[in-house]
A protein has these predicted regions:
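Edge strands and adjacent loops of beta-rich recognition modules
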Residues: 95-119
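Glycine-rich loops and low-complexity Gly/Arg-rich segments
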Residues: 56-60, 93-98, 160-164
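N-terminal start-of-chain detector that recognizes signal peptides
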Residues: 2-7, 39-45, 90-93, 105-110, ...
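Single conserved position on a long alpha-helix in the C-terminal lobe of the eukaryotic protein kinase
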Residues: 1, 110-239
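An N-terminal domain-start capping segment
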Residues: 73-103
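Leucine-rich, highly hydrophobic segment in Treponema pallidum outer-membrane-associated proteins
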Residues: 1-84, 119, 194-210, 219-223
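Generic amphipathic alpha-helical segments used as scaffolds and interaction surfaces in large
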Residues: 53, 57, 68, 96, ...
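Helix-biased "structured C-terminal domain" signature
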Residues: 57, 65, 95-97, 171, ...
Length: 239
């Protein structure tokens, strides 16, 4: 998600490979094709097969400076998490504390997550920033109840013993003033952002904010502010 510690999977199993026909025009690249894995293999493509299709382009949820994004359905979360829990990141040794936080977040997602996720990388307003902003937006079914659930969960979460230092990150409201009225939360360390973005190396620190029917997750506070400020100013890609 744009951080120094981030990585991507260096390889993928053959069952995840796909054969695509591609068509181009001035506005888009269109791909259609087939995968060669059988339906019973645990691949991302098979996990997606169980989801309800998404229609349309989510440009109204993307800042105008977006240079990479993806959007996919999560109407069947069980199949998504069944796939992600078997990836390389899951083979790492995480503490019982982090595993417990993951379980809590899975319960939260199953209760309140909507049916689609959109994530993007986009440019900061500050040209001196070395890294882009990164955000994941998860539609939620009941924003008020979901935020209350999150607050109660955070209140009940014990402090992590021997936790690494929290990276210094600021919401930078001076640069992004229209984000100030939306409360940001720093979450206990967990791997949910890793699971839902495919990034396998992370400091596991995640920041969250509820915004107009969505739960925003980011690896730093400034990304949340930058995203909300762009949405509030209608500085978006649209269709």
């Amino acid at each position: 998600m744009g951080k120094n510690t981030d990585g991507i999977r260096p390889q993928t199993h053959l069952g995840s490979w796909a054969e695509l026909d591609m068509k181009f025009n001035e506005e888009a690249v269109y791909c259609s094709g087939i995968s060669h894995g059988v339906d019973t293999t645990r691949t991302f493509i098979n996990a997606l097969r169980k989801q309800k299709p998404i229609t349309g382009f989510g440009g109204e949820r993307l800042p105008s400076s977006t240079f990479f994004y993806n959007q996919w359905a999560i109407s069947d979360l069980e199949s998504i998490f069944d796939f992600t829990s078997r990836q390389e990141y899951a083979k790492a040794t995480y503490s019982d504390y982090i595993k417990k936080r993951d379980e809590e977040w899975m319960d939260f997602m199953k209760e309140y997550a909507g049916e689609n996720v959109i994530s993007c990388l986009f440019q900061s307003k500050d040209s001196a920033d070395r890294h882009p902003c990164a955000i994941m937006s998860i539609a939620v079914k009941d924003e008020v109840q979901a935020e209350r659930y999150l607050q109660n969960m955070l209140y009940a979460t014990p402090r992590e013993k021997d936790a690494p230092p929290v990276p210094q990150t600021s919401p930078n409201y001076k640069q992004y003033p229209r984000a100030r009225k939306y409360r940001q939360y720093m979450l206990p360390r967990n791997t949910v952002l890793t699971q839902l973005t495919g990034i396998t190396e992370s400091a596991l620190h995640t920041y969250a904010c509820f915004y107009k029917g969505a739960l925003l997750l980011a690896p730093d506070a400034q990304s949340l502010s930058a995203y909300i400020d762009a949405m509030e100013n209608e500085d978006v890609l649209d269709g």
